Amino acid sequence: MVKMIVGLGNPGSKYEKTKHNIGFMAIDNIVKNLDVTFTDDKNFKAQIGSTFINHEKVCFVKPTTFMNNSGIAVKALLTYYNIDITDLIVIYDDLDMEVSKLRLRSKGSAGGHNGIKSIIAHIGTQEFNRIKVGIGRPLKGMTVINHVMGQFNTEDNIAISLTLDRVVNAVKFYLQENDFEKTMQKFNG
């Protein structure tokens, strides 16, 4: 069995600290905590790090396809490793949630998120585990694109840092317990 934890974002230093890259930030924190290193895999169009936890292989993935094509990398890896959809978790930003709010779900629509739209289109289902991190709505007069491509202010950065620690703990808990329902009960809120 293989589990796959995917963080959504855009590759390149230009996007590194943007709100839309919260999934990449989460994966970076998780692999740092678990002392896992990434390799660039051109075949899968992703950066991949893997380790074994409880005798199961766990792949940590940052698609390098850019957000709107994330489903290409996710589908390729699910197919190659024959990963059951219940063993997939996708971490991403949600602008309909307050900054730093954490929400775990086992299914749902894309909610306007193009990375999630791409994954749903490529894997053919909305029923996969996700961890959403709130980035808040744009300020009055600001476009959504400018908001998601902007960086967090100092105050929000502190809150997001604490939330990313909770994401690390949620993923580690899930990998130990092998129970996303139990993980949702413990970490939602």
From Swiss-Prot:
The keyword Secreted does not apply. Its EC number is 3.1.1.29. One of its GO terms (molecular function) is tRNA binding. InterPro entries: Pept_tRNA_hydro, Pept_tRNA_hydro_CS, Pept_tRNA_hydro_sf. TRNA binds at residues 15, 66, 68, 114. Keywords: Cytoplasm, Hydrolase, RNA-binding, tRNA-binding. The keyword Zinc-finger does not apply. CDD domains: PTH. One of its GO terms (cellular component) is cytoplasm. The record marks 10 as: Discriminates between blocked and unblocked aminoacyl-tRNA. GO terms for biological process: protein quality control for misfolded or incompletely synthesized proteins; rescue of stalled ribosome. It catalyses: an N-acyl-L-alpha-aminoacyl-tRNA + H2O = an N-acyl-L-amino acid + a tRNA + H(+). It is found in: Cytoplasm. The active site is at 20 (proton acceptor). Hydrolyzes ribosome-free peptidyl-tRNAs (with 1 or more amino acids incorporated), which drop off the ribosome during protein synthesis, or as a result of ribosome stalling. Monomer. Belongs to the PTH family. This is Peptidyl-tRNA hydrolase. The gene is pth.
